[in-house]
Regions:
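DNA polymerase sliding clamps and clamp-related checkpoint/processivity subunits
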Residues: 1-173, 179-282
Length: 282
């Protein structure tokens, strides 16, 4: 198995962040699912790595990778933040080929960062061949910090991600919005579009095998711009399970659970606000 454990030097002491993993495809697999915009903000703490991509200060994707997923995760400051081009990072991570977790060999990764103004350095090794990449970082633009406290949640569903992906892929593309509806008295989770050919409903029964939990404290019915929901399709494609929560303002959060090696899980959160224009028109 390739690794860099024998290549540590005294230079490692200058790094404020150092990550090592035996299978770089894991991080590539997760980050590819949130790559709908180029700029990404990395936030590293003792709890792990969080990578945020957002658009128009509204829709947002966050990938979370806990320290246990890495072979080594060393951080020398309480919090480290920087911004870099995610597309460039993925090109570096995939320099040896496909990022498919099930195919081919797995390159080893070592990533380190020395602080503000310095590049992120990446070493990849596969079959004795080592590639050294450096990616320029910039001062990060502040991202929205969505406060999704449990007290504000009025609807929550845990269900199969495969089922939700199938529904999303078949939504009427002529519809500007998609509506999520559920209520304490309803036996279904309803997804509705409003296209040129009319209104189209998909009802997923509460008692079906694909729904694990459906809890609702009051009637929920909010619309979302279909174009803003599209970035959720990639995480749906690699997740085993999804938790959907809606708060009293209509903010929806999808949390995708993604299984990786050694029975560890990584998570991706997707946030999208309700379409206020449509809510006001009703």
């Amino acid at each position: 198995m390739p690794n860099f454990s024998s290549q540590s030097t005294s230079g490692d002491q200058s790094h404020i962040l150092m990550i090592r993993m035996d299978n770089a495809k894991i991080i590539s697999h997760i980050l590819k699912a949130i790559n709908f915009k180029e700029n990404s903000v990395f936030c590293c703490t003792k709890d792990g790595l969080k990578v945020t991509v957002e658009d128009m200060k509204s829709v947002q994707l966050n990938a979370f990778i806990e320290p246990v997923v890495f072979q080594s995760y060393v951080i020398k400051e309480e919090e480290i933040k920087f911004q870099l081009n995610l597309t460039v990072l993925l090109e570096c991570l995939n320099v040896f080929g496909s990022n498919n977790l099930q195919s081919g060999t797995s390159p080893a990764l070592k990533l380190y960062y020395n602080g503000h103004g310095t590049p992120v350095s990446i070493l990849l090794e596969e079959s004795g061949v080592i590639t050294d990449c450096k990616i320029r970082t910039v001062h990060f633009d502040p991202v929205l910090d969505y406060d999704f406290g449990s007290a504000n949640v009025i609807g929550r569903i845990i269900m199969s991600s495969e089922c939700l992906k199938e529904v999303f892929c078949e939504l009427d593309s002529t519809s500007d919005t998609v509506q999520f509806s559920l209520s304490p008295d309803s036996a279904n989770f309803r997804i509705t579009t409003f296209g040129h050919s009319g209104t189209y409903h998909v009802d997923i029964p509460k008692e079906s095998d694909v729904i694990e939990t459906l809890h609702c404290t009051s009637a929920v019915s909010f619309k979302y711009k279909l174009t803003l929901m599209k970035p959720s399709i990639k995480p749906l494609g690699i997740a085993q399970k999804v938790s959907l929560r809606i708060d009293d303002t209509g903010l929806v959060c999808f949390q995708f659970m993604i299984k990786v090696e050694d029975n560890h899980n990584c998570y991706i959160d997707f946030y999208c606000p309700a379409d206020v224009d449509f809510e006001e028109d009703e």
